[in-house]
Amino acid sequence: MAPPVRPGMLPLLLLLLLPPLGSVPGVWSFSELFFMKEPQDATVTRKDPVVLDCQAHGEGPIKVTWLKNGAKLSENKRIQVLSNGSLYISEVEGRRGEQSDEGFYQCLAVNKYGAILSQKAHLTLSTISAFEVHPVSTEVHEGGVARFSCKISSTPPAVITWEFNRTALPTTMDRVTALPSGVLQIYDVGPEDAGNYRCVAATIAHKRKSMEASLTIVAANETRSFYMPTIIASPQNVTASLHQTVVLECMATGYPRPIISWSRLDHKSIDVFNTRVLGNGNLIISDVKLQHAGVYVCRATTPGTRNFTVAMATLTVLAPPSFVEWPESLTRPRAGTARFVCQAEGIPSPKMSWLKNGRRIHSNGRIKMYNSKLVINQIIPEDDAIYQCMAENSQGSVLSRARLTVVMSEDRPSAPYNVHAETMSSSAILLAWERPLYNSDKVIAYSVHYMKAEGLNNEEYQVVLGNDTTHYIIDDLEPDSNYTFYIVAYMPLGASQMSDHVTQNTLEDVPLRPPEISLTSRSPTDILVSWLPIPAKYRRGQVVLYRLSFRLSTENAIQVVELPGTVHEYLLEGLKPDSVYLVRITAATRVGLGESSVWTSHRTPKATSVKAPKSPELHLEPLNCTTISVRWLQDTEDPAAIRGYKLFYKEEGQQEHGPIFLDTGDLLYTLSGLDPRRKYHVRLLAYNNMEEGYQADQTVSTPGCVSVRDRMVPPPPPPHHLYAKANTSSSIFLHWRRPAFTTAQVINYTIRCNPVGLQNASLVLYLQTSETHMLVQGLEPNTKYEFAVRLHVDQLSSPWSPVVYHSTLPEAPTGPPVGVKVTLIEDDTALVSWKPPDGPETVVTRYTILYASRKAWIAGEWQVLHREGAITMALLENLVAGNVYIVKISASNEVGEGPFSNSVELAVLPKDASESNQRPKRLDSSNAKVYSGYYHLDQKSMTGIAVGVGIALTCILICVLILIYRSKARKSSASKTAQSGTQPLSQASASVAAGSDMGKNLERATETAESLVPMMPSSFIDAKGGTDLIINSYGPIIKNNTKKKWLFFQDTKKIKVEQTQRRFTQAVCFYQPGTTVLISDEDSPGSPGQTASFPRPFGATALDTEHSANSEGSHETGDSGRFSHESNDEIHLSSVISSTPPTSNPLAGGDSDGDAAPKKHGDPAQPLPAEQTSAPQTSAGLRYAAEGFPV
């Protein structure tokens, strides 16, 4: 049971259990800024006062201002801001001209951290309109159903009641139902219900009455016949806001009176808690929620039959926005990137927008908005602010906030200065700057930022440069465009401020494409050529001239007409009737003429075609990348009759499609299934029964399917599965895959490559390719590189892919091994040694040694040895005396093999050569004519070696003899111990007078055990410190401070006497209260039958040396429990007592845990339990060797 909580501790516990305020999404700490109260929608009458709440909390001072419809609201005598931030309007004014207090209000709270904007509050005046629907007079048979309705619009919604003959109609009767929607239902009508009815609509400030409608009762027949149920008032589709009340009307007639029931079309159950039936079948839903939305079915059924009829209505529930993901506050360094994510839901779907310190953010340059995300690139100190995500729809608005904190580095460099730009061409601008005045020596890189100066939603581009340059040419710019530039300097701890912005304009260029022309004929001898201006992105400057060229299709002579750039049509006159003319146009800027359009053909009408229809006025408009809208108008003054139209179209350079026959009433046609970014030629003509009319020709181009400039498109995902493999010491092969969810056509890829840990940004390598693989060359050998890839699609760039690391192969050794020496160490064996090739970057994995005698060398026969790269020596064996050997070495790795060293010669002299001629000639790798590496061994050296070897062999022989002697002594001791150990020990009860017999036994045991002294240090560790007193299972241990000696250096007889006396002294003192004492079987007072039941101290426990329950000493002292004796004397004793092998104990195999068989507590032969012993039995952990000796 949990302990009770004291009343005084409850607030403290609640405080501890509550999460920190700043950890809840959308809630901030009190030191910053948030709203405790926000303004709410209000409806008031004219001249009434109103208060809109606004209470902000945070670190002061806090200033509150108000906005009305997005503009700052000025205070006056009638409109004041209270001390708590609320807005007070003493008299609300209605519309007077353009002045009105109605509108949307928001409060803006500002402190040192930034500013936040409240949600919108709609202030409306109470109004009411005239009746839109009045009750209508009706006649009803007695016993039938009467229904009246009225409708009126008001703010707030009016309460509608009914009057009968100018008096309030009671609705307490079961057969009378008044619906809130303005419907009156009367069932089972009688003569008393006849009269005049009207509805009354009332609001908080207004009241209106409708026109009267009369109810006439017609006498019913005496006998009423059966008729099918009929729904006379079916439910209507309803759209309601959250928490409103909805009424679905369903009124039916029939005989017998039908029964009305409700269900949902999706077979879901109807909410019984908020739903009830009003009157005789109307469904009313109070406190509407989202789950109430759906299709409701009203069913009218004749009782006792299967005759029924149904009616359905849809209930749509609108909901204000609500957040499902809130933006989180961020801390970012200068020049970093911040991403805020905000998602909201509602019905209809809310529109998302972002605010910075209460002001709306527009996507441009560094700041981009992608759906519900806000991305801020190249963060600057001015970006430190409070950001709000606002979601709004027709039901309201909601805001969430987050703060961006920009971290500033104290020793960051100052901004680059004296930035100036110079136009180089129509697509290139030279940008130059001066290094920062402060901390310029710490600059590691510069970044150049540029974007278009005009328009919105312009993309900002960035180029990273090294710290060794202060100028850069930016190319691939659009001609005749203004660009804005700025520079940022980078250091390891952060970035500088932005430099001053400079703006520069690129030069003009020739037009990128010609105008699209339209050709029509007004008579048989003319052609009207018209064209549209070239779009700005293709114009590339100001068009100053149009050159119009035309010719007959059967002639080569071209006629040219030049027109000013302000003209967009021209009439070619004096042409031949019924002839095909080819027309083209070229536009020119001040730089020169651009590309000419293709020849467009047009046939002039026949000269006799007096009754031919005139050409229609044709207009072409691309609807999307695959569809063109064709519109035309026919001249209303054309006297010729028109039967229809013929439409032809073709792609430039392809065959013509058509004709497509259209009716005379058709003035619109859509061409679909076209290809994007293609030019199409369309011609249209009217025809009648006699002949075809004049045709109209026009060209148009379909746009691309992805328009990046006109709408924001999120960037594509990065490439994935990037794989790197070293190809050579200077190249690495890269392979990757395009994103799985990208359907756009990839333009190219950019590969970023740089060594790991690069400090100089100018050394970053950027490569372009259109393939999904690339061989990166020109790399440094044996260097680790990092690689990343990004793709580019329609002027969009993906993020960089995850980085992949890979090292180039080491370079093949460029030099041979150095310091090659050859030494003859035996008559037929030589030692070759060398050093690795020079150069710190050289990696060697293998050495190749070639050697041969001069005869074999002449024949080209080499003997080959291989050694690993870590070995720098080798033995040359089986050399033949009397020959001169040539040796050379090379180094290699997985890339290749390096050159061989200079040959080194070694002369192997014959055995009968004189001592005076034993020194051979030397030749090293630097001089192939001199013998090298042969070290002469004279007589003195050989004598020293022989003496050393003799001493070593003597020592080895002595050690072998000692080991043989000790081995024999152990075998003898084992046999004696086995004989004496067959008789069990019993508890000691002898007195001091019996010490002589015990002394004999101990002396005999000592003689047996003295050869078992282990030559090992004491393993007892007193981990806790303390005195020198050591206690084990045999009592206190008397420390022997005498110097230890090896057995074969001591006097054996003297040892026996001293040890016998010492054993006797200890044996006399064995008995202690509560202690188990072990004595030999000859002095045991127990009978032979009893001794068999004694547990042997070490016999049973030896079966479990690691986990014995009796090894408590190890827990107390930190010892392992195997040895706890300090001196050789105690080791002797334990050896004597435990010399019996464990298998001699009949109880040893009966307990796997090493414990003795249980005995009665009163048995004198039973050892006391472990918890009653005065000393821990640390000796229980002794292990035995195969011969039975303790280890």
From Swiss-Prot:
GO BP, sorted A to Z: negative regulation of neurogenesis
Pfam families, sorted: fn3 (PF00041), I-set (PF07679), Ig_3 (PF13927)
Tissue: From mid-gastrulation to early somite stages, restricted to posterior neural plate and mesoderm with an anterior limit at the level of the rhombencephalon. Posterior restriction is progressively lost during somitogenesis. Expression is maintained in the neural tube and paraxial mesoderm during this process. As development proceeds, further restricted to the dorsal parts of the spinal cord and somites. In parallel, expression progresses caudally during axis elongation.
Localization: Membrane
Topology feature Cytoplasmic, residues: 965-1191
Residues listed as glycosylation sites in the UniProt record: N237, N624
Region Disordered: start-end pairs: 975-1010, 1079-1191
A GO MF label: signaling receptor activity
Alphabetical UniProt keywords: Developmental protein, Disulfide bond, Glycoprotein, Immunoglobulin domain, Membrane, Repeat, Signal, Transmembrane, Transmembrane helix
InterPro entries (alphabetical): FN3_dom, FN3_sf, Ig-like_dom, Ig-like_dom_sf, Ig-like_fold, Ig_I-set, Ig_sub, Ig_sub2
Residue ranges annotated for the Fibronectin type-III domain, each copy included: 415-509, 511-607, 612-711, 718-811, 816-911
GO-annotated cellular components: plasma membrane
Domain Ig-like: 24-124, 126-216, 229-316, 321-405
Signal sequence annotation: 1-23
Annotated function: May play a role in anteroposterior axis elongation.
PANTHER family, per the entry: PROTEIN SIDEKICK, PROTOGENIN
UniProt protein name: Protogenin
Species the sequence originates in: Mus musculus
